[in-house]
């Protein structure tokens, strides 16, 4: 899709975003991912603090804490998925929003669902690189919502087949 920007400018931005996942603020979240991606972390203030004041989330009411932001695409060479994640009042983008993006990419690109340990860590705000044995998404019942037009997409059959091979290889390596 031509957005009217010079290709050299778009390529520079894409390269910088890939750098964020390789050596930048989300490098730990995407460590070991079998696909390349590009992303940008962000933090948005929910309230203004004084010029001389130091930000301390622990001293603020939850509704006053910074928002965690992350935009990303994958695979980097030929993007199939682009997303934006906003986690209200959660803090730094690399700590909360980027791990969610990793799980979405793993689901959509690899057909993998987080392990129970990973879900428990995420609920405590401790998510980073996936932990535990990821499960095939096809083995996890998909919870349907009341509005059937608002259900998440299921991975394609080719993704599921590739995922079974990836899980088998990862299990054999452990």
Task: Describe the role of every protein-language-model region.
Residues 1, 98-170:
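Short, gly/Ser/Thr-rich active-site loops of penicillin-recognizing serine hydrolases
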Residues 1-2, 8-115:
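Active-site beta-strand/loop architecture of penicillin-binding DD-peptidases
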Residues 172-174:
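Short, solvent-exposed mixed-charge patches
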């Amino acid at each position: 899709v031509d957005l009217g920007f010079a290709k050299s400018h778009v390529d520079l931005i894409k390269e910088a975003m890939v750098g964020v996942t390789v050596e930048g603020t989300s490098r730990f979240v995407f460590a070991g991912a079998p696909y390349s991606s590009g992303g940008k972390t962000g933090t948005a203030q929910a309230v203004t603090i004084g010029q001389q004041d130091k930000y301390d989330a622990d001293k603020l009411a939850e509704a006053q804490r910074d928002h965690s932001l992350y935009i990303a695409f994958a695979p980097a060479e030929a993007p199939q998925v682009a997303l934006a994640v906003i986690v209200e009042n959660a803090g730094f983008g690399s700590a909360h929003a980027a791990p969610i993006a990793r799980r979405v990419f793993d689901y959509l690109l690899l057909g993998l669902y987080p392990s129970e340990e990973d879900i428990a860590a995420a609920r405590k705000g401790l998510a980073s690189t996936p932990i535990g044995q990821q499960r095939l998404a096809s083995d996890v019942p998909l919870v349907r919502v009341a509005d059937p037009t608002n259900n998440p997409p299921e991975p394609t059959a080719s993704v599921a087949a590739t995922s079974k091979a990836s899980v088998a290889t990862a299990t054999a390596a452990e």
